[in-house]
């Protein structure tokens, strides 16, 4: 795993094509798995009017590309949105009635589809350019982990930033979707508000 620094993130994200940058920004601020991003659906969104926001609830039976790539441990997965993740979601509204990130090739009926994965040739090319930019800026080679940064490292980055910001292990587990038992859908608005506050703490930390 390679958690990125904020400087590395800004270098990498500047090299990503717009649709990938939106998904990556959402992923590094929500701790979602790759398939939970590319196949995110509007009908999974649940408004929380008391907090003037919404959350996403990934169904327990969501399998992603193949059965092992969706929700881990067979439970629903709650995704809370910090301010950055929320702004990404708001920017996607109205693009498509089904998919939050409708960036795949249109199907035979001309309807939007999701991409299969974020870790595609565009990601890999951006990674090469980012490593070169890193070397130009800091006059030393990019760390090996950054030069070969994987999409999954965005989730590790989120987890590391939560820890650096002093978020408790219990709340980190809830935010990363590691919590066992399908109690995630039974949070009160106050508990959700606390989780959102915790997720917002990462905006001012670096590690």
Pin down the residues of each PLM region:
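Residue-level marker of regulatory loop/turn positions in helix-turn-helix DNA-binding domains and
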Residues: 1, 5, 15-17, 26, ...
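Basic, Lys/Arg- and aromatic-enriched nucleic-acid-binding interface segment
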Residues: 1-40, 95, 155
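Conserved tyrosine-mediated DNA breakage-rejoining catalytic core shared by Y-recombinases
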Residues: 3-11, 30, 39-91
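Active-site/catalytic core of tyrosine-dependent DNA strand-transfer enzymes
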Residues: 7, 80-146
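Hydrophobic (often cysteine-bearing) scaffold residues that line and stabilize catalytic clefts
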Residues: 19-20, 81, 115, 119, ...
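C-terminal catalytic core of tyrosine-transesterase DNA break-rejoin enzymes
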Residues: 22-25, 29-36, 153-179, 186
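Catalytic-site neighborhood detector that most strongly recognizes the C-terminal catalytic loop/helix
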Residues: 62-65, 86, 107, 165, ...
